[in-house]
């Protein structure tokens, strides 16, 4: 990390890098738009792109690449970005209160599930790939694991039909075999071939190797 920081001159530009980090947290768990982050931080786009690379190389964050194997609906080509720790995001945002119903609760819940997926991959299945899918028409699925399992994360305690739109749209492509919603419902159930799992059950099955 010291070499990367020295190479980019970060030690001489701490205020700018601090602005970058704060702006980067606003894109956490979202599509990564270097130009928007650059505008928010008052920096050049090329600088922001290079600094995101440093975050990845120093394992402070990770880009999730888009899943592009759809035909009926064209996929967005931007990656999503997740910091390595929820506490870091919260600290850089000034320690906002994260409560059920707050605007940050859903993205933080999604981030929490991503961190579990990433940990499972790193420790149990290093060859596995985590992707996400979003169509140009607005359909989205939060995670796709190994091009086999589509996972939508909802912080709700009751999942409705509208919450399944992205999974159903992806199912029409015929490229994915399994579909799950990870949520805060009290019990597992099945809805039109889509598994709806409490997050605790999902994590138990993930770490037990019973998702596929």
Feature-to-residue mapping (PLM):
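Accessory nucleic acid-recognition modules appended to NTPase machines
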Residues: 1-149
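Short active-site-adjacent structural elements
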Residues: 140-141, 159-162, 187-191
